[in-house]
């Protein structure tokens, strides 16, 4: 079985092949996200704490969290599920996945180092791969460089150097900062608030005008109704007098 071990602190990962069944036996019957020591892999792994993050069986089917079996099952998967990427909106598909319990039928087991041990592992903990991209959001740049609200974030953006051409000046690529508070943004915010206040005042004024007009129409309707009733009463009185 192959074991793919990653160390997020350095950004490195290493694939090792383990043929000895006794070294792999402590991992059997363990679930995904289970934390355990890696001392069974050898003396150089003494003190290391790892987490089982997944794996693939010999036919390439991935392990899926939450499927409590060590075999293969067919599940109806949709958007938001692991082990499946929908090609169309609302598309669902029945896919074969392996359960979250480790057994001997896996070809690759994925581990993540949570705690470093006593010795360094060559190619995993002794080297550091720098991140290609820095933070893009203004709040995260402030958090990275411990800046205040008064400091200018634009001076602290991580610029990525582009491949230099012969006889040309070195160029850098700067990401666009998101959620950056600028005078234009504050002015736009003030403008939107003023527009909202004017809209609210206009709405109140229109409501008051409509209420006055409605009261006037209702008053006119009541007066017309009273006039019709009085004229009908007078005509009925005249008819009764003429019959008498």
UniProtKB/Swiss-Prot annotation:
Q: Which InterPro entries match?
A: Ribosomal_eS6, Ribosomal_eS6-like, Ribosomal_eS6_CS
Q: What does UniProt say on post-translational modification here?
A: Ribosomal protein S6 is the major substrate of protein kinases in eukaryote ribosomes.
| Keyword set, alphabetical order | Phosphoprotein, Ribonucleoprotein, Ribosomal protein
- Gene3D superfamilies for the chain: 1.20.5.2650
Q: Which Pfam families match?
A: Ribosomal_S6e
Q: Name one GO cellular component term.
A: ribonucleoprotein complex
Q: Which Gene Ontology molecular-function terms are recorded?
A: structural constituent of ribosome
Q: Where is the composition biased (Basic residues)?
A: 186-201
The record's region (Disordered) falls at 185-244
Query: Carries keyword Cell membrane?
Result: no
**Any one of the GO BP annotations:** translation
Which residue windows does the record flag with biased composition (Basic and acidic residues)?
A: 231-244
> Which family does the UniProt entry place this protein in?
Belongs to the eukaryotic ribosomal protein eS6 family.
Provide the function of this protein: Component of the 40S small ribosomal subunit. Plays an important role in controlling cell growth and proliferation through the selective translation of particular classes of mRNA.
Provide the protein name.
Small ribosomal subunit protein eS6
Write down the species.
Answer: Branchiostoma floridae (Florida lancelet)
Per the UniProt record, the lineage of the source organism begins with: Eukaryota, Metazoa, Chordata, Cephalochordata, Leptocardii
Encoding gene per record? RPS6
